[in-house]
UniProtKB/Swiss-Prot annotation:
Glycans are attached at N271, N283, N422, N455. The gene is XOAT5. Keywords: Disulfide bond, Glycoprotein, Golgi apparatus, Membrane, Signal-anchor, Transferase, Transmembrane, Transmembrane helix. Belongs to the PC-esterase family. TBL subfamily. Residues 1-22 are cytoplasmic. The keyword Phosphoprotein does not apply. This is Xylan O-acetyltransferase 5. A motif (GDS motif) lies at residues 242-244.
């Protein structure tokens, strides 16, 4: 997603001299001081930025275009490292010789006390020391728009339409500690959150992980307006499809909008693989469909899927896809369930229930590509681009390998309370960048149906502080005191606390939806077949 670049970085300078005059002033100053160094244009621009004259990027500015004292840290990296991380699970075993971490069950979690953060940098110089961790954003929250139409106009100006020139990549930026504007909702105010993600209720002692806001370089994300989004979703269906990270994001989206509906006008129904949150007043639904590999697999049971030997049918998608047809907004993901082994087991005829199950093995990246090709063919054939919008979420990183952010003696993400914001080296948290690249290439190659690739990976790698760690469930029960005392085995560094990081992912989705032109009228949900 690109939005118009914010002019002048931290805000316009009233009566500021022209660029030529500014450059001349720098040369004049150098001559007066007797400096006989020939500056090239890049050095001059850097000097101007350091002295606050003009400038395009905001270095350390808060949201909305400025704010001295805002803590801002950057990460724009899209490097490629292929260490393997634990797959969706509870027990982490010692890595096999291939360097792949193997994992078994399906859930564990954790907590976080302090430490000095580590900054990931984005190609800019990392010599400067970030501001004190206690600095906070001093700006006041932006005023609420007086109407949905005003908010829509503002969002259109930022995200949609013709950018008229230079635009801004919203996935390149920094995390800003913004106690005034974050979080977007309170954990205690959203009754639809599951115990898996309610970290504060489950015993986490700090809440700083809720107060970081993503600030793109040189532009701003539109402020989340639940009422505006629900107007866009009136008579429509929005569905997350994939694994438990997409379920994590679905819960976030439900909490972001649910306060706009009275209690008696909203409901949540769980029916096997499909969870449906309905807002009667808007005749809209926000849904989650469990399909961890998108295609058929032996892990498709939404409740009993703690399977070590995962087997897939890479060309069989129709059974799941029958539930996606006609949905107005589709948000797909698949990643963490691929990370158990370096090879995937492919069903060789027959069915998963027939014993013994016969299968072939395929290298993981090749199998992932085969599955995404099956998925993309279904999308191209069955999705009407005039009616529906498709998103694909990039890799949600795990934080199992603390040496990757400079703490070899730490235990995974346990006791992390701050993002990796001061780390001057490349983060190495075990992300499989080959799978990332495969998903990116497949989605970009699609012709008939455009797919929005939501690039959450690099910005999420910084957030080692935001996982559920030991403050979560294990096999449907909260961790015991004894289990919490054993974070090496029980800390969940896969899933995320809510409120938290997935709210930012949904802000990207929100930006696309509210800035897109209104789709043609569709048949109200009440007249569509009920799922």
């Amino acid at each position: 997603m690109r939005i118009p670049r914010r002019k002048g970085g931290a805000g316009p300078l009233v009566g500021a001299p022209s660029r030529r005059a500014q450059v001349a002033a720098v040369f004049a100053l150098a001559l007066l001081l007797g400096v006989s160094v020939l500056y090239d244009s890049a050095h001059i621009a850097a000097s101007l930025r350091r002295h606050g004259v003009g400038g395009g990027g905001s270095s350390g500015g808060g949201g909305g275009g400025g704010g001295d004292g805002a803590r801002a840290y950057t990460n724009t990296k899209l490097s490629a490292t292929t260490e393997e991380a634990e797959a969706e699970a509870a027990e982490v075993r010692s890595p096999p010789a291939q360097g792949v971490e193997s994992a078994v069950e399906a859930t564990d979690r954790g907590e976080a006390p302090p430490e000095q953060p580590v900054a990931a940098d984005s190609g800019a110089s990392s010599a400067e020391t970030p501001p004190s961790l206690l600095e906070q954003v001093t700006e006041t929250p932006p005023p609420s728009p007086s109407s949905s139409s005003a908010a829509a106009a503002a969002a259109e100006a930022q995200v949609g339409g013709d950018h008229g020139g230079e635009s801004c990549d919203v996935y390149k930026g920094r995390w800003v500690y913004d106690e005034a504007n974050a979080p977007l909702y309170k954990e205690s105010a959203c009754e639809f959150l599951t115990e898996q993600v309610t970290c504060m209720r489950n015993g986490r002692r700090d809440d700083d992980y809720q107060k970081w806001r993503w600030q793109p370089d040189g532009c701003d994300l539109p402020r989340f307006d639940a009422k505006l989004l629900l107007e866009k979703l009136r008579n429509k269906r929005l569905m997350f499809v994939g694994d438990s990270l997409n379920r994590n994001q679905w819960e976030s989206m439900v909490c972001l909008v649910q306060s706009e509906a009275p209690w008696e006008k909203k409901s949540l129904v769980k029916n096997d693989s499909l969870n449906v949150f309905r807002l009667e007043e808007y005749n809209a639904t926000i849904e989650f469909y469990w399909s961890p590999f998108l295609v058929e697999s032996n892990s498709d049971d939404p409740n009993m899927h703690s399977i070590v030997d995962r087997i897939i049918k890479p060309t069989s998608i129709a059974k799941h896809a029958a539930n996606w047809e006609g949905v107005d907004y589709l948000i797909f993901n698949t990643y963490i369930w691929w990370m158990n082994t370096p090879e995937m087991k492919i069903l060789h005829g027959g069915s998963f229930s027939k014993k013994p199950v016969k299968y072939d093995e395929m290298e993981r990246v090749a199998a992932y590509r085969k599955v995404l090709k099956t998925w993309s063919r279904w999308v191209e054939k069955h999705v009407d681009p005039k009616r529906s919008t498709v998103f694909f979420m990039s890799v949600s990183p795990v934080h199992m390998q603390s040496e990757g952010w400079g703490k070899p003696d730490a235990i995974k993400c346990f006791s992390e309370t701050q993002p990796a914001i001061n780390y001057t080296k490349k983060l190495e948290v075990g992300t499989d960048w080959d799978l990332f690249s495969t998903a990116h290439h497949v989605t970009k190659a699609m012709k008939r149906v455009p797919v929005h690739f939501i690039n959450i990976t690099a910005l999420s790698e910084i957030r080692k502080d935001a996982h559920t760690s030991v403050n979560t469930l294990r096999q449907g029960k909260l961790l015991t005191k004894e289990q919490k005392a054993n974070p090496r085995k029980f800390a969940d560094c896969i899933h995320w606390c809510l409120p938290g990081l997935p709210d930012t992912w949904n802000e990207f989705i929100y930006g696309h939806i509210v800035s897109s032109p209104q789709r043609r009228p569709v048949e109200p949900i009440e007249n569509q077949p009920q799922r």
